[in-house]
Amino acid sequence: MRLLIKQRVFSWTDTFDIYDETGNPKYFVKGELFSLGHRLHVYDASGQEIGLVRGKLALLPVFEIELHGAYLGRIEKRFTLFRPKYDLEYRGWRAEGDFLGWNYDVYEACCVAVHVTKEPFHWGDTYVIDFSNPADELPALLLVLAIDAANCSGS
């Protein structure tokens, strides 16, 4: 299964449109302009809020993710000199790869649960999330949004 994340270029806040593999709108994401810490609200196609990525005040970027109002997990950027690394607190998932180049995998045990790539030659950033388990769709989306927010935080 696949989701496409397209970032809107001319927007005051982080705004993303999310499409399914056939190109139909599935979700949209809207960031808060004035908030203490980074906040991204995820809505389904009918406009109901279904998820939240919330930045916590910390020395390095830390993000909590919520699904349908319930705590789902946490993503924390580790201190490294050259390449960013993240600690994930969700079902034993771990992320490896090139986060700044948007080519990374999320593993559950020894298997790839989610594969993330950046599509070249698009107006604005376009990311592709591939996953095999339909139950991983929203957790994977929230995780990718949190990693994007952590990369953009500049820490």
Q: Where are the regions that the model predicts?
A:
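Intrinsically disordered, low-complexity proline/glycine-rich segments
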Residues: 1-155
